[in-house]
UniProtKB/Swiss-Prot annotation:
HAMAP family, sorted: Pantothen_kinase_3
Keyword Nucleotide-binding: yes
SUPFAM superfamilies: Actin-like ATPase domain
Catalysed reaction, written as an equation: (R)-pantothenate + ATP = (R)-4'-phosphopantothenate + ADP + H(+)
Pathway membership: Cofactor biosynthesis; coenzyme A biosynthesis; CoA from (R)-pantothenate: step 1/5
UniProt entry keywords in alphabetical sequence: ATP-binding, Coenzyme A biosynthesis, Cytoplasm, Kinase, Metal-binding, Nucleotide-binding, Potassium, Transferase
Top EC group: transferase
Protein known as: Type III pantothenate kinase
Listed cofactors: NH4(+); K(+)
Length: 247
């Protein structure tokens, strides 16, 4: 089995693949203080390490990247594929400094299975809108994610506190909890809807839209756009990149 690590700032979205399909997924908490040994103990609670024959790491957290590399080499006796400059991805990047482009953006783009221009909406710690055409990332929008927005209100105001991410029944709230939920959740929905129109004006062409990420189901239910969902898009991209880099 091939293990696919998508390391985000909040969690490590992990997939297991037979080389063709994504067979199983699970999440581990991202913790920059965890040692390779501790991550291995956590990993063993999900999968028998003896069945792992390949590893790929796509990460936006350098300390965790190093921990997973050490885990792979020490316990699995394997050399992992790591998405970094020089790794074959099949994705081109239109950017002032391509080295700054996150592994998550590249893996999402690599997960697409059609040649049509596509806007990928990835909802995580940060919300990313990634425009891909002809296997090239031509532009990206990054905004605070839902949980990050709630943390910001909780951490920087005296009277507003952290609330659960839920969709309130109406836009105009009548208590603090519903007011925050409306601002964060509906605010994200309206941001996406508004950016969709502005992006279409800018690119001057029709495009597919795919939504992914841990909170994609919540947003998809209420957004007024024709969108397809693919929760495993980033893992599919990691698998495609892995195949390009094994001998």
């Amino acid at each position: 089995m091939i293990i696919l690590f998508d390391v985000g700032n909040t969690s490590i979205y992990t997939g297991l693949s037979n080389g063709t399909n994504i067979d199983e997924t699970f999440r581990m908490n991202t913790d920059i203080h965890k040692s390779p040994d501790e991550y291995f103990v956590t990993l063993k609670s999900f999968i028998d390490p003896n069945v792992i024959t390949g590893v790929i790491i796509g990460s936006v957290v350098p300390l965790v990247t190093q921990a997973l590399i050490a885990l792979t080499e020490k316990y699995l006796k394997l050399k992992p594929v790591v998405i970094e400059p020089g790794t074959k991805t099949g994705i081109f990047v239109k950017a002032d400094n391509p080295r700054e482009v996150g592994a998550d953006l590249i893996a999402n783009a690599a997960g697409l299975d059609n040649p049509h221009p596509t806007l990928i909406i990835d909802l995580g710690t940060a919300n990313k809108l990634i425009y891909v055409k002809n296997q090239m990332i031509t532009g990206v929008i990054i905004a605070p994610g839902l949980q990050l927005s709630i943390h910001a209100l909780d951490g920087n105001t005296a009277l507003l506190h952290e609330v659960d991410i839920k969709v309130p029944k109406k836009y105009l709230g009548n208590n603090t909890i519903h007011c925050i939920q409306s601002g964060v959740v509906y605010g994200t929905i309206v941001m996406i809807e508004g950016m969709f129109g502005r992006i279409r004006e800018e690119v001057g062409e029709d495009f597919d839209v795919i939504i992914t990420g841990g909170l994609s189901s919540l947003i998809l239910e209420h957004i007024r756009l024709d969108i397809k969902q693919d929760k495993e898009l980033v893992l599919k991209g990691l698998l495609n990149i892995y195949k390009k880099n094994i001998k």
